[in-house]
């Protein structure tokens, strides 16, 4: 007979007699790595008796003894019913050959194990400092990214190809290689941040922003043609304020990039940058357009503005509305909102307005804490990954401070991320009515990772669903009622609007503060 051997692991099955109970046998399968060649096996015939195997009776071959360089196999050729099994008898030679085979098997398994372990290792050639930084970025995404198909590509193969083909001789070339890698994910929120931008982003979530001190939003019909982004406010004493930029001015360009197609999320990133760096703005004030070059600096940001507004009435019995404008979710946001609520409740407010228009988000934990102020119980948000719900954020009411007063939440297409979580939680728990237009639809959650050279990665690690299990990504939170385009955009204008019963803030008055 011929045995066709290959370089792969080949199965050899045999049945081992059970000496304790002859009526039962043990089926054994060995995987033997055979050499890549064809070898002739020896063939011997033996007579078969119940007591022994005789070599002298060749005329009645009951057993065929087949050997190759690894194993000797005894096949029964008699007509007794054997259920198709091949019986193995051990002999001195067989035991010796079996021992050799087992040694080879162990060697093969050891080699195979080593191969498996080293599959995830970088290529064997020498790695430079730039290569190692690229690998650090690759590993960060590999471990944290929500989509484990990596946009349908082989993430391991991309690593090997990039290390072989992408130039990484300088830090700038390495940054470019990392950006190209991130771009293959086709995720606008997973992005690479050079050291200056990473530092600016981190400081922005800590209550201070290295920028020009502007709060921006989308234009409304009352602002005229949508030819850019509108200035909501300029931080007192900040670069924009000192340059004479006023609320209502339109930003038409940032560093030679038109803002007509920019989201406020992208524009906010462009306005921030390393302290001391310059940014050029094209500002339209009325009919005049100015080009201003501003120097970025650290600007303290108070994320909350609030005001107690009285409706026309009879003196101290006039209904009072507490207006809270939340512009961002930095690490001061929850404490500032708590302080505003407690101050307004101390003045016996009858209802609240929480204005989240043009709030592009920020710190996820701050959004969760603020939701707890308004809810006596319930789910705030579900955190989901590719396998389903991963975590649940809820409240038992222990942090609630304003659960009884009617609440209206104002949103628009500039309401994104953490502010959408807050609006969705208050809506789905029937705590508030939501007014405005569908929100931005940023239903993904990012974590920020610092790399060894001070640069960083913002990586999408999860998505969220509202308490009603609504996935708002690219769809947004749908409001309960529309809001007039001319509705006031800040606390002073809102209080002034309430003094005029014919103004926009009196439209839907029967609904605005109802539960």
Swiss-Prot record:
The keyword Protease applies. Protease involved in the C-terminal processing of the chloroplastic D1 protein of photosystem II. This proteolytic processing is necessary to allow the light-driven assembly of the tetranuclear manganese cluster, which is responsible for photosynthetic water oxidation. It holds the Pfam family PDZ_6. It comes from the Eukaryota. Belongs to the peptidase S41A family. SUPFAM superfamilies: ClpP/crotonase (SSF52096), PDZ domain-like (SSF50156). Keywords: Chloroplast, Hydrolase, Plastid, Protease, Serine protease, Thylakoid, Transit peptide. NCBIfam families: prc (TIGR00225). It is found in: Plastid, Chloroplast thylakoid lumen. One of its GO terms (molecular function) is serine-type endopeptidase activity. The active site is at residues 417, 442. Transmembrane segments: none annotated. GO terms for cellular component: chloroplast thylakoid lumen; mitochondrion; thylakoid; thylakoid lumen. Its EC number is 3.4.21.102. The keyword Amino-acid biosynthesis does not apply. It comes from Arabidopsis thaliana (Mouse-ear cress). This is Carboxyl-terminal-processing peptidase 2, chloroplastic. GO terms for biological process: proteolysis. It catalyses: The enzyme shows specific recognition of a C-terminal tripeptide, Xaa-Yaa-Zaa, in which Xaa is preferably Ala or Leu, Yaa is preferably Ala or Tyr, and Zaa is preferably Ala, but then cleaves at a variable distance from the C-terminus. A typical cleavage is -Ala-Ala-|-Arg-Ala-Ala-Lys-Glu-Asn-Tyr-Ala-Leu-Ala-Ala. Gene3D superfamilies: 2-enoyl-CoA Hydratase, Chain A, domain 1 (3.90.226.10), 2.30.42.10, 3.30.750.44. Residues 198-286 form the PDZ domain.
